Amino acid sequence: MIRKAFVMQVNADAHEEYQRRHNPIWPELEAVLKSHGAHHYAIYLDQERNLLFATVEIESEERWNAVASTDVCQRWWKHMRDVMPANPDNSPVSAELKEVFYLQ
C-alpha cells in the first residue's frame, strides 16, 4: 500500500456543511474510490485555520489518479466547489504532504 496525505481548505462558514455532505458520501463515489484501490480514507478538520488534512492508502498512483476522470468524481467536485477553494476544473485546491515519520 502507498500512504498519501494532503491538505485542502474549507470556507470558514462551511465547516458544518462540508461535514454534512460527507456523512455519508454518495454511495457511487464510495464505490469508485474502493474500485480504484483507495482504503482507510480519512479527512480531519482544523477549525481554527479552516484546513482539511486527508490521509488515504492506495494500491497504485495510476488507479488513484484515474478517479479524477470519472463522472462521479467530476460531479462531486462540482457539488463541493461552493464550500471550499477550487481549481478551474472544480477539483479542490490541495497540496500533497511529505511523510516524515511513520510508526507501524
UniProtKB/Swiss-Prot annotation:
GO terms of biological process kind: rhamnose catabolic process
Major localisation: cytoplasm
Keyword Cell membrane (UniProt): no
Pathway: Carbohydrate metabolism; L-rhamnose metabolism
UniProt superkingdom: Bacteria
Single GO term (MF): L-rhamnose mutarotase activity
InterPro entries: Dimeric_a/b-barrel, L-rhamnose_mutarotase, Rham/fucose_mutarotase
Reactions catalysed according to its record: alpha-L-rhamnose = beta-L-rhamnose
Group of enzyme by EC: isomerase
Locations listed in the record: Cytoplasm
Record keywords: Carbohydrate metabolism, Cytoplasm, Isomerase, Rhamnose metabolism
Residues the record marks as active site: H22
EC number: 5.1.3.32
GO cellular component, one term: cytoplasm
Binding site for substrate: Y18, Y41, W76, W77
Stored NCBIfam families: YiiL_rotase
Function: Involved in the anomeric conversion of L-rhamnose.
Subunit architecture: Homodimer.
Family the entry assigns: Belongs to the rhamnose mutarotase family.
Name by which UniProt lists this protein: L-rhamnose mutarotase
